[in-house]
Amino acid sequence: MASKSFLSLLVALFVAICFVLSPGVDAAKGPVITNKVYFDIEHGGKPLGRIVMGLYGKTVPKTAENFRALATGKNSDGEDLGYGYEGSSFHRIIKNFMIQGGDFTKGDGTGGKSIYGSKFPDENFKLKHTGPGVLSMANAGRDTNGSQFFICTVKTAWLDNRHVVFGHVLEGMDVVYAMENVKTSRGDKPVEPITIAASGELPIEHEVDEQGNQVPFRIEL
């Protein structure tokens, strides 16, 4: 009887150690942010502020790279794309829902393109629309991702498994909320244009653990 109790204790201890050492424990704190990009926003030609976004390149590498490249105007080799988000506008604003942009070809929500061609498939739906600041791909149905995206201003759970979440706002939610509250006209279009005056990539400053190893940059969702 005593031996069985001792064996059960050993098994429980082993499971506990495995749980602590498991990478899934860190994953519970949130997905790894691999890149940081920014938009400098103007409203009616006047500076509104900067939005800094973290991209989840480990979870959705293809989608994150598409956004990073379009934000910088350069591919992974540093070569100019000749197109991207800089100079484009947010064409759709819905209060208590989201702000949408990324159509740099037509500017009205009917255009845009990805770095992989016109459209690319949904990568996965592992990440959810958990609340304000979530960065997700706009689409016209299954596997129709291009360059259009939206930033949530509330939790939008009904979009889970329909739109690919690939990032989160790290700084500048005050700018997002200011954008959310501008006056709009028919079709939810801002009366005065909201434009991305400048965009690019920022370095990630990693923390270092006691062994001198870089700690993955995450945010808790």
Curated annotation (Swiss-Prot):
Q: What is this protein called?
A: Peptidyl-prolyl cis-trans isomerase B
Per its UniProt record, what InterPro entries does this chain match? Cyclophilin-like_dom_sf, Cyclophilin-type_PPIase_CS, Cyclophilin-type_PPIase_dom
- Tell me the GO BP annotations in alphabetical order: protein folding
Instruction: Identify the stretch annotated as signal peptide in this record.
Output: 1-27
Task: Please list the residue ranges annotated as the PPIase cyclophilin-type domain.
Answer: 38-201
A Pfam family of the record is Pro_isomerase
Where is the major localization of this protein? endoplasmic reticulum
Q: What does this protein do?
A: PPIases accelerate the folding of proteins. It catalyzes the cis-trans isomerization of proline imidic peptide bonds in oligopeptides.
Spell out the family assignment given in the record's similarity comment: Belongs to the cyclophilin-type PPIase family. PPIase B subfamily.
Q: Which GO terms describe its cellular component?
A: cytoplasm; endoplasmic reticulum; endoplasmic reticulum lumen
The enzyme's first-digit EC class, named in words, is isomerase
List the ranges annotated as motif Prevents secretion from ER.
218-221
Segments traversing the membrane: none
Superkingdom of source: Eukaryota
- What species was this sequence derived from? Cryptococcus neoformans var. neoformans serotype D (strain JEC21 / ATCC MYA-565) (Filobasidiella neoformans)
Q: How is its activity regulated?
A: Inhibited by cyclosporin A (CsA).
What reaction(s) does this enzyme catalyze? [protein]-peptidylproline (omega=180) = [protein]-peptidylproline (omega=0)
